[in-house]
Amino acid sequence: MKKQSKTHKVDYKYYNSGSKTSRNRNVQQLETNNKIPQSDVVGPVVKISKEVTNETDIISPNNPIINQNQEIFDTYQKSYIEAKKFLNDHNIKISTITLDCKLGTLIDVDLFAKNVILKEDQIVSVKFGNRNDPATNRTIVVLKTKKKPSTKNFYNQVTILMKPTNNPERNYINIKVFKNGSLQMTGCKDMEDFNNVTVKLIEILKNGRRSKKDNKHIKFITDPNKIGIYDVKIRMINSDFKLDYKVDRKKLAKILKKYHGQNTKDKEIGYVECKYQPTGGHSCVNIKYNNDGNKTSIFVFQTGSIIITGAKNLNHIISAYFFIHKVLSRYYKKIKILPLQQNLVQLEIAKYFQKVNQKTYPVEIQE
């Protein structure tokens, strides 16, 4: 009996892209194929929730293109859920996703910073303008701060902190809200985090608030009817995993430069662009991997920790994972740092002191 895919509800009422005609065409085409995308794919304007399967979720670098061209949508090698399963099965963790989008309306960042209500399940921190102004720099949580706090004053954007309510264990997500209606977001672990906090933020901006003095409505945005999620773009995904052995970075860098330089004849791995600076910079071998025009950085540390940064989607991470494993597997015996065996170490120490005790020293005779 075939196992049914797990379904979840997605609210598309704030998702917008393209003209009305193109949106309707996309709705019909996607519904016909039963491929209503969630995650980061910008969906059509729909007032009701849709039942969608996890198997159709895909992380893509440019959502409007996906929404306007079903063929591009179908060219992605793996679905979002399949890619996430691969990462989980291979203990690859997403550390952060950096992305941005547009809300389709201007925002009065000054009024927003001064009047937005801070709540634990919504916005918990606001930073705007002069960092010494308590009216526009407020928080209800205690967080670790930088040793040297920023002294720069920003008047074109508000920085807020929000935690995804769908996953309370997540750290706070840092969101920069700009006057022109753009958002820049860091700290998401997956696109569900993005969807959760963005929809909540839109509701806050759309509702505004009532003034305590005269009960007048304070508007945070210029056009509540046009606010939505437009042009979502993933800028970078950082991930990491751990090897079960330690790596001799010096040997690895030497091997790559010797056998995989620009004039290499190796066809399987080919040219590998790498840097290793033991003093200064990263204490790792920095390998650049080009995947379909997207240059991903792979950091190999002595501890066996591997960081993959600069990916635009999950398939970039998976491709970089296979590449670095191909390199490390070929030279495994040469680059692996053998662990010290305690019994052999103790035996060598005992032999050393035994030799020291057996030595005879000349004795001075006093006349």
From Swiss-Prot:
Family membership: Belongs to the TBP family.
Signal sequence range: none
Q: Spans of biased composition, class Polar residues?
A: 16-26
Q: Which species does this protein come from?
A: Acanthamoeba polyphaga mimivirus
* Region (Disordered) location: 1-26
- Protein name per the record: TATA-box-binding protein-like
Q: Which GO terms describe its molecular function?
A: DNA binding
Key words, A-Z: DNA-binding
